[in-house]
Amino acid sequence: QANVALLAGGGTNNPFRCYSSYAVAKIGLIKMCELIDDETEDLNIFIVGPGFVKTKTHFETLKAGEKAESNFGRVKELMDSNDKGTSFEDIYKCLQWGAAMGREVAGGRNFSVVHDKWGTERLESELKQDNDMYKLRRYRNNWK
């Protein structure tokens, strides 16, 4: 079984002020991942949100200054700090886990390296039982 891993980004699970175009593109990528998973049974495709990673992409926010509104201060603080953000090792481990779990567990799903309990038997069991879990949709809206 082939594996494809995509990277999500900020604004996919919460509003991301001043970055709406970026967020909409990443949300589209999440949905595309789910649709390809549904249409391609011999492919394990999943998407991973790495969290804040110190990379050059953040220089654009710093360059924008006050136009980036509250994001400027937040990014500047993180870039100036000793906090390295999410490590490449953690991101790689999550990607390896998603590939190893295969389509039954990871296929079409959106994982957070930082906030999800990936790598645990409990989550793997839940994902096997709930095809809607960790996917982009209105979910459980029929409760009374």
Regions found by a protein language model. Name each.
Residues Q1-E41, G49-T55, F59-G65:
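Catalytic loop of short-chain dehydrogenase/reductase
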